[in-house]
Amino acid sequence: MQNISSSAAFADSKPHYELLDGLRGIAALLVIWYHIFEGFATSPIDQRFNHGYLAVDFFFILSGFVVGYAYDDRWKTTMNTKDFFKRRLIRLHPMVILGAVLGAITFCIQGCEKWDGTQVSISMVMLALLLNLFLIPAVPGSGSEVRGNGEMYPLNGPSWSLFFEYIGNILYALFIRRFSTKQLTVLVILAAIGLASFAVCNLSGYGHLGVGWSLLDYNLLGGFLRLLFAFSAGLLMSRIFKPVKIRGAFWICSIAIAVLLSIPHI
């Protein structure tokens, strides 16, 4: 189903698919569910809700689809690179800022055995906050990496996905939007091969593809491959997609996503 109202901020915004909004919400809830069970895991491959991390890949696919659908046909008329980046900044960065500020506050008041935020200097927390506000990754082992577990954004761990979201948007605006559908298909295939090779070789060291949240080892490479494949696949889908009406589509898709993400490791 489509919502025919447009955003007040952008008068030329296209109608959006409410179904995709709903599925994004379902995937977000599944990520929370995944991380709750992660706290009870005995190993990287025993996380109860084992493939919940793939919801991030679903987000990347959705982002690619929405960006392609919303902007592909505007570049020859009203859209330029500056305008595109302005729109995406307005769409994405409020979440970065809000998450960083809330993360800093909760870090300063927490006092659990695992991470006692009261034992970290305020100056380092403020430095971590500043880096997070500008989406600059913290260097593992540095003072600004206040949790000490190698995260790019220790005050708000999920910001790593927005870091790659920005990379996807930059690649789209500067290069990928100019690709023909055939060239885009080739890119998707090559990215899929790269991601599959990463998985088969277990470069993550975890036995799965839950990577991208750290600068350590091959983590950054894995995150980039996840982004490149999923975001490009979403862009390709936006070009070849033909809308059809399916009764109960939201529930069918929601159940399918939940089942796929809960499949145990073999």
Residue ranges and their predicted role:
Residues M1-L19:
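Short, Lys/Arg-rich, polar N-terminal cytosolic tail immediately upstream
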Residues S13-I26, I122-S123, L187-A191:
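Alpha-helical transmembrane segments of integral membrane proteins, especially early/N-terminal helices
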Residues P15-R74, I90-A100:
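Functionally critical transmembrane alpha-helices in membrane proteins and complexes, commonly lining
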Residues L20, D83-F84, L92, S161, ...:
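Alpha-helical transmembrane segments and their helix-entry boundary regions
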Residues F37, G68-D72, G103-F107, I176, ...:
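Membrane-water interface at transmembrane helix exits
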Residues T42-Q47, C112-T118, Y206-L216:
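Membrane-interface helix termini and inter-helical loops of multi-pass transporters
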Residues Y53-V56, D73-E113, T118-L135, G168-N169, ...:
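Transmembrane alpha-helical segments and their boundary/interface "anchor" motifs
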Residues M124-I266:
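Aromatic-enriched alpha-helical transmembrane segments of multi-pass intramembrane proteins
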